Amino acid sequence: MKIDRERSIITLKIKLRGIIMYKFLLTKLDQDVYELFAHFFEQAVEREKLNVLAEKTNLSKRRIVLVFERALDLQKAYPYFEIALHEGREMTLYFAPNFLLSKLYSVMLAESMPFQILDRLFSDKYVSLEETAQQHYVSNRTVQRKLKEVETILENYHIRLNLKIKPLFVGEEYRIRHFFHIMYWQIYDATNVR
């Protein structure tokens, strides 16, 4: 009985860490895209009025329009859905038979700055703060804030980031391996259908 309880606690901690990473690595807009798609996917609806959708998803109509625009951008990288906004009052979202919500998440994750920073750090290909800012068309200060966010998530795994000396990741090796295993699993595993 005690062993089952300990396993449950460990499983819960792992799930919470995954949620924390999910919340951290995606922008707020991408999180909203994911939640909107999850609503359509899980409810098996194809058409929804914006005011009803706003109520069900806790997003404003204006935010839903931003989500729609972001979804159009994502459609170029992952074309397994059709999305349309009709007269600013109704949204339709059709999924192809091979659409995976987890794959959409992977596409958004691959584009996110925190993931790209962590990926470069992991592969020892990190470039300077200025180059990173130029690659993402943001200010140096924005990259610094993203690095702070990266440090925050690493702290959840008892890992520190030290850009001055190698190794860049400071912590117990099994924790570092576990963190990157989880991170890469989230982007490359397309079997987890929500």
Outline where the language-model segments fall.
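Inter-domain helical "communication" segments and dimerization helices
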Residues: M1-R194
